[in-house]
Amino acid sequence: MNPRLRSAMQAARSANMPKDNIERAIDKSSIINQSNFENLRYEGFGPEKVAFIVETLTDNKNRTASNIRTIFQKSGGSLGTQGSASHNFSQLGVIKIDKNEISDEDILELAIDAGANECNSYKEFHEIQCSINDIYNVKKELEKKISNFISTSIEWIPLNSVEISDKKKEELINFFETLEEDDDVQNIYSNVKFSN
C-alpha cells in the first residue's frame, strides 16, 4: 500500500469514518487515477500581503487556474508564479497525536529519540515535525509506543508569520472560505497569525 493511501486511511479511521465510506473513497480514487487528474500548486499573496500556497487536484487546469486567479484578484491579492510564496515556507512531515495518548514531557522525549526536528503540544493534540524524507521512519519509531495517531501528512509550514489585526481578520477568513468552496482545492497554507 502506498504511503499516502496508508496515511489517508489512518486519518479516516482516527476520525471514526465508517468502513463503507473509506472503501467508497478508495474506489473513487482508483477512478481518479484512471482519469487525467493533476495535482497543481498555486502560490500568491492574499489580503494584507499574506503568503498563500493552494494545492489542487483537477481534471481541467485552465478552469482551476482561472478560478484561483479570480479568487485572489477579488480579494485584492495576486496570484504569483511557482516560488513566489513558497520561499516563506518549509515543507515538512507533520504527525499529529491525540493529547490523551501521552504526556507533554514523554512525547517530547519520544519525538527526539525518533529523529523529529520539533515537537509542540497544543490543547487537543501533539504535533511532531520532521524532514519529509524521515516522516515514515519517525512514525515507525513512534508506533512502538503510540497507537492513536490523528494524522500523518506533508505540509507547508510558515518560516515567519504575518500578524493581522482583528479588523482585517474577517477579510482573510472570507478569503479562506472562498478558496475552500472551490471543488478543486485540496489544501490551503498561509503564514497568517491573528493578533489577540
Language model features by range: what are they?
Residues 43-57, 62-90:
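RNA pseudouridine synthases
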Residues 1-4, 39-47, 79-89, 147-159:
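Flexible hinge/switch segments at interdomain interfaces of large molecular machines
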Residues 1-56:
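Translation machinery proteins
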Residues 33-34, 72-79, 99-104, 108-109:
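A general structural motif
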Residues 8, 68, 107:
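Aromatic/hydrophobic pocket-lining residues that form π-stacking "cages" and hydrophobic walls in ligand
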Residues 16-21, 61-64, 103:
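Helix N-cap / loop-to-helix initiation motif
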Residues 91-196:
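Positively charged, low-complexity, intrinsically disordered RNA-binding extensions
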Residues 9, 13, 26-30, 72, ...:
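Structural signal for hydrophobic packing residues in well-ordered secondary-structure cores
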